[in-house]
């Protein structure tokens, strides 16, 4: 049975039993670090780096939109009991920005994107002096976010520095391999079909990394509204460029995407839904798609197949249930 170390009334015996499970590791000086992470992508990264030296609680699960999420009472309780909280930054968790800034004055709170070089970021069209926050869509950039996690876990648990650094190195190597797979797979899409149209503009870094034209019905934030002019403009693009497929997202309504399909059909061009992509949230916990690696593998494989590439539905490691 999983021991919930975030509960203040967790029996001491249960905590000791959990620690005993680390027998194959160096002797731990304390109980595992209690970590809170806002998004699933960050929670997955911290679990991969921290291993059994951390217990991670993610605030936003599968299908949850971070652009509109607000902290709950249970979130605040978890953060109160945590040793450290990691959030994304770059205005991703916009409704929580003020709360997190205030929390930072009384607890350990760190934005994993803080150390990224602005030169590699995409300017945010909706806000002045801001950037597109969806950096996890580019494996090379996302791997750089491990540095803050390693530094802060090590500050709290210096005895486990080697574990954290080795796990982070493994994470980076996996990210590099995923980037290579993505590049090779997406090159199989015919050049004229390299157009990715989704519910909102979350795939800018994907497009920049893999030479795709990326179009979102809504802006970078799902809080922006799509007007009739935008829908009409995108319908014309679908028809003119004979785009075969568009994509829905797990954390965004498909209403606008279906309006596009209907608009294109009215002009005599059939467009299908190429599949469901993970944009701002990963898949269900406990599944391959419920990890960052699985999330990106699924997206790349789904996009490639829907746009004409002859690639396996099982993905990079053969772990996908089948792109859909």
Language model features: what each stretch is:
Residues 1-10, 14-27:
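N-terminal secretory signal peptides
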């Amino acid at each position: 049975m999983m021991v919930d170390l975030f509960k203040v009334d967790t029996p001491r015996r249960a905590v000791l039993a959990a620690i005993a499970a680390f027998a194959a590791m160096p002797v731990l000086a304390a109980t595992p670090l209690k970590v809170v992470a806002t998004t699933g992508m960050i929670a997955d990264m911290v679990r991969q780096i921290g291993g059994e030296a951390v217990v991670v609680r993610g605030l936003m699960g599968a299908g949850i939109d971070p652009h509109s999420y607000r902290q709950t009472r249970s979130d605040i309780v978890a953060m109160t009991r945590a040793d450290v909280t990691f959030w994304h930054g770059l205005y991703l968790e916009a409704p929580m920005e003020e709360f997190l800034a205030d929390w930072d004055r009384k607890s350990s709170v760190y934005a994993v994107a803080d150390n990224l070089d602005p030169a590699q970021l995409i300017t945010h069209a909706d806000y002045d002096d801001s950037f597109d926050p969806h950096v996890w869509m580019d494996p090379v950039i996302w791997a750089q976010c491990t540095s803050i996690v390693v530094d802060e876990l090590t500050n709290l648990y210096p005895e486990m520095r080697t574990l954290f650094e080795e796990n982070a190195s493994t994470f980076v190597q996996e990210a590099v391999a995923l980037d290579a797979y993505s590049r090779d797979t997406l090159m199989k899409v015919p050049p004229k079909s390299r157009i990715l149209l989704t519910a909102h503009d979350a795939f800018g870094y994907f497009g920049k990394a893999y030479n795709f034209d990326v179009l979102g019905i809504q802006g970078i934030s799902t809080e922006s509204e799509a007007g009739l002019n935008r829908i009409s403009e995108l319908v014309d693009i679908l028809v003119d460029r004979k785009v075969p497929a568009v994509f829905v997202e797990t954390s965004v309504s498909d209403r606008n995407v279906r309006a596009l399909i209907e608009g294109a059909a009215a002009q005599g061009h059939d467009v299908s839904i190429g599949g469901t992509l993970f944009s701002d949230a990963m898949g269900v916990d406990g599944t391959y798609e419920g990890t960052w690696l699985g999330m990106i593998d699924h997206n790349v494989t789904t996009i490639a197949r829907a746009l004409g590439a002859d690639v396996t539905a099982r993905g990079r490691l053969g772990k996908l249930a089948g792109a859909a």
